[in-house]
């Protein structure tokens, strides 16, 4: 690693120390000697041989807090790596769930394959968050070695190459092309995360992929829902979003003010209240969750349980429920390197006195898809919810309602 690179990462490590000391919700930092750890990781940084190892030192420093919402976002990479596959937890087991047509992954993997190991890492619920962070943000891989079990239980190994898409390491915001790319880099992600509602008989099935809607968007959605007797709110795969969006969602489901919980920040504790307004949906409510339902999804599911408002069905949730802010950093003048830190600035304690971080929400009815369901494209969980809603929807048809949308490369 060059001297300039060493200095760049040393600045990042120092900023990580300072942002946490300034903004982290727990002034005691869980009893950690943060400055002593900084000195320790500064020593580790001197041994880093390249940028990747340097980034891992910064990430490991923040991981000492063992907090799902506090982490390092490395600089914009000169290459984008598309794996061509998606994987997800079902219970304590990881499965391949999606394959990009035409990718190397599609020629070697099968939907429904159980992922035993990825490039030497054993994949399970306990380490799943760290594995996702490593492969997707911290150290994207140009190839992945898999140890797999087919839906029939047959073991095999596969070596899957990722697709490399080149882009600039440094964006020059005085360059019109670079500026356009910077301003539009999130548009395709937003399109893929859009909310969708399907009406079948007396039920509305609302696929809410993120809590990213404003009050007007939520009001329009509830305008559709109000026409039906049952709402199936599908929060599977929903990682969370903004607390304001959660408040508006809760307000649309209850005829009274609802305390989401207490926001315990560094200096004070304040109640978070969803104020009811207008005409709430008063019909039957079924909420679907899975292991990828995080943050606001978990809060909403637990509120439904605490308030006895409906039934929660599916898998135990992600257990990643804190409130954080992202602090962006740059190095360089006109030609900038962008990176930053997510820092938890509040703990959310629910009205029953419990914190969902590291515990999650256990559904009222535990119901998981099988490997065979995944392989065949069946959604047995949604089909069961439809049955409870009094509508006919077989697992095959349920699996086709909300097809996965790959972003263009």
Regions found by a protein language model. Name each.
Residues 8-13, 20, 37, 41, ...:
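Stable alpha-helical elements in mature extracytoplasmic
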Residues 141-334:
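Cleft-lining beta-strand/loop regions that shape enzyme active-site pockets
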């Amino acid at each position: 690693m060059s001297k300039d690179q060493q200095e760049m990462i040393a600045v990042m490590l120092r900023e990580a120390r300072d942002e946490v000391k300034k903004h982290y919700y727990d002034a005691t930092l869980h009893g950690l000697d943060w400055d002593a750890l900084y000195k320790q990781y500064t020593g580790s940084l001197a041994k880093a041989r390249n940028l990747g190892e340097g980034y891992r030192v910064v990430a490991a420093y923040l991981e000492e807090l063992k907090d799902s919402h506090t982490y390092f976002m490395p600089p914009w990479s000169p290459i984008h790596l598309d794996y061509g596959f998606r994987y997800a937890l079902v219970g304590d087991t990881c499965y391949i769930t999606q394959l990009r047509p035409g990718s190397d992954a599609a020629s070697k993997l099968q939907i429904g394959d159980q992922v035993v190991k990825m490039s030497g890492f054993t994949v399970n619920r306990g380490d799943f968050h760290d594995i996702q962070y490593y492969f997707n943000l911290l150290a994207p891989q140009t190839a992945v070695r898999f140890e797999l079990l087919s839906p029939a239980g047959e073991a095999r190994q596969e070596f899957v190459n990722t697709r490399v898409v080149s882009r600039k390491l440094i964006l020059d915001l005085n360059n019109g092309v670079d500026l356009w790319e910077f301003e539009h880099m999130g548009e395709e992600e937003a399109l893929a995360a859009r909310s969708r509602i399907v009406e079948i008989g007396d039920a509305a099935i609302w696929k809410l992929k993120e809590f990213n809607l404003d009050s007007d968007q939520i009001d329009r959605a509830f305008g559709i829902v109000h026409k039906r007797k049952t709402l199936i709110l599908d929060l599977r795969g929903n990682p969370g979003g903004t607390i304001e969006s959660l408040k508006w969602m809760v307000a649309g489901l209850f005829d009274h003010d609802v305390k989401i919980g207490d926001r315990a920040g560094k200096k004070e504790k304040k109640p978070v209240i969803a104020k009811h307004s207008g005409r709430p949906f008063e019909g039957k409510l079924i909420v679907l969750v899975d292991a990828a339902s995080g943050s606001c999804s978990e809060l909403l599911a637990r509120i439904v349980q605490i308030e006895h408002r409906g039934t929660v069905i599916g898998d135990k949730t992600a257990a990643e429920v804190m409130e954080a802010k992202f602090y962006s950093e740059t190095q360089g003048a006109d030609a900038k390197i962008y990176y930053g830190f997510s820092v938890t600035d509040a703990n959310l304690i629910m009205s029953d006195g419990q914190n969902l971080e590291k515990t999650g929400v256990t559904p009222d009815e535990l119901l998981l898809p099988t490997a065979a369901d995944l392989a065949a494209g069946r959604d047995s969980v949604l089909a069961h919810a439809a049955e409870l809603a009094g509508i006919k929807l077989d697992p095959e048809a349920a699996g086709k309602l909300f097809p996965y949308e790959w972003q263009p490369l």
